[in-house]
């Protein structure tokens, strides 16, 4: 199994797809990396030579921010928004949708499971 950026790449998949197992690399970026290294996207990971794996590793770790560094940068960006008190930062802090979606209905993924609010009780009947 090839190991790139601290991630074990699956052996039986095409290299184009296998690279997407690295956080921060999608299909488009995977194709760009393969074009830079000159590797055929249809090659299976198990068929890569050590030189090709080394070339992939050099491009991924040298030119792109992936895995832990990328996660850390995203967390710091969100923390910065919260610290300077922006509207987006406040939405992150309250676990509400950040990009202007409605919250009266929907937004269940972001808000979590419903918190049931008891209805107003009727006053007991007087005789």
From Swiss-Prot:
One GO molecular-function annotation for this sequence? Answer: structural constituent of ribosome
Its name, as the record gives it, is Small ribosomal subunit protein uS13
Show the GO cellular component annotation of the record.
cytosol; small ribosomal subunit
The lineage, from the top, is: Bacteria, Bacillati, Cyanobacteriota, Cyanophyceae, Synechococcales
Q: Is rRNA-binding given among the entry's keywords?
A: yes
Quote the Gene3D superfamilies the UniProt record gives: 1.10.8.50, 30s ribosomal protein s13, domain 2 (4.10.910.10)
Positions of transmembrane segments = none
* Species annotation: Synechococcus sp. (strain JA-3-3Ab) (Cyanobacteria bacterium Yellowstone A-Prime)
Which terms does the UniProt entry file under GO BP? translation
């Amino acid at each position: 199994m090839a190991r790139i950026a601290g991630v074990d790449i699956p052996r039986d998949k095409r290299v184009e797809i296998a690279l997407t197992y690295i956080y921060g690399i999608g299909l488009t970026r995977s194709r760009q990396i393969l074009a830079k290294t000159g590797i055929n996207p249809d090659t299976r990971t198990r068929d890569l030579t050590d030189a090709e794996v080394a070339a992939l590793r050099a491009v991924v770790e040298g030119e792109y921010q992936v895995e832990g560094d990328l996660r850390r940068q995203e967390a710091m960006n969100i923390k910065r928004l919260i610290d300077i008190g922006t509207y987006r930062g406040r939405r992150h802090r309250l676990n509400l949708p950040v990009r202007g979606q409605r919250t009266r209905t929907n937004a269940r993924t972001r808000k979590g499971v419903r918190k049931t609010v008891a209805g107003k009780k009727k006053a007991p009947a007087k005789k």
